[in-house]
Amino acid sequence: MKVRAEGLMNGSPLFYARKILETIFTILLAFYLQYQTYYLPSAILMGVAWQQLGWLIHEFAHHQLFKNRYYNDLASYFVGNFLQGFSSGGWKEQHNVHHAATNVVGRDGDLDLVPFYATVAEHLNNYSQDSWIMILFRWQHVHWAFMLPFLRLSWLLQSIIFVSQMPTHYYDYYRKTAIYEQVGLTLHWTWSLAQLYFLPDWSTRIMFFFVSHLVGGFLLAHVVTFNHYSVEKFALSSNIMSNYACLQIMTTRNMRPGRLIDWLWGGLNYQIEHHLFPTMPRHNLNTVMPLVKQFAAENGLPYMVDDYFTGFWLEIQQFRNIADVAAKLTKKIA
């Protein structure tokens, strides 16, 4: 295979060492600003660090650097559980299915946002037409953007729940690795709460907590929602399920690349390439992009790439389409 022959599946230890040191330096700089009483800039910088750590746990959990999966797992516990507060195993539990069945209704857990949002019309069937939830659905395209900053808080809570249940998980692997994840999360909250403790008063602590987590949440969410929510969803019975490449290309939208975007988005602006080659390291996605474009053109497949505002508007339109259906259903009983 050409991508393997050109070494595009090989991760660079120097690249990942630099990225880890870069995020640790960002955290230390946030500590320093806090020490100098620049509390708001410190909180914002912590949010940036947590976003960047999100890309690193994503990459190590995809086994992009080491050939030995055990070393990738250890790295994911460090950048994920300890530094970030996210469960490595919990991430794999949902994300691996997302890759195998991207935007497939009833399989891709990323589509399951009920009761707050309906990503497909089928979700409306689960609620009565006079339910208050249907009112939320009617206006979901309006309040969607306001919920993006809360993504990190949601993932933190999900991580705590998942890790607490790991010792009794039905997968033997999770039972064996539960202690690593539990220690990692415990240490994360130890240093994270200690950081808040050294702030001068409760009002500053509350400000710091919410600013750092909401900034980190928005920086994560504006990326991870762009790629798939703006495109079509498919039924499990669809013929596209028999062609992995078609499924990934037709359910994914890229963000236009650039130096700043490549850094800010952690390489996920090359989401089509990432979905076709999940274990390909971030620093090679730009190189493989022309090959993927050529493959799409030769096979009559769309290669969707847009600027952020175009993609975000298409994302909003997808939610509005479902909102319109919800509005019609509720009007029938008005």
List PLM regions with ranges.
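Alpha-helical bilayer-embedded segments of polytopic membrane proteins, i.e.
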Residues: 11-53, 80-85, 138-153, 172-224
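C-terminal, active-site-flanking charged/polar segments
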Residues: 212-225, 229-230, 293-298, 302
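Membrane-embedded catalytic scaffold of the fatty acid hydroxylase/desaturase
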Residues: 46-170, 237-326
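Juxtamembrane transmembrane-helix termini
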Residues: 161-168, 198-201, 230
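Short acidic alpha-helical/loop segments enriched in Asp/Glu that coordinate divalent cations
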Residues: 229-238
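Membrane-proximal N-terminal segments immediately preceding the first transmembrane helix
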Residues: 1-7
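C-terminal regulatory/interaction regions
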Residues: 299, 329-334
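Residue-level signal for inorganic ion chemistry
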Residues: 2, 228, 274
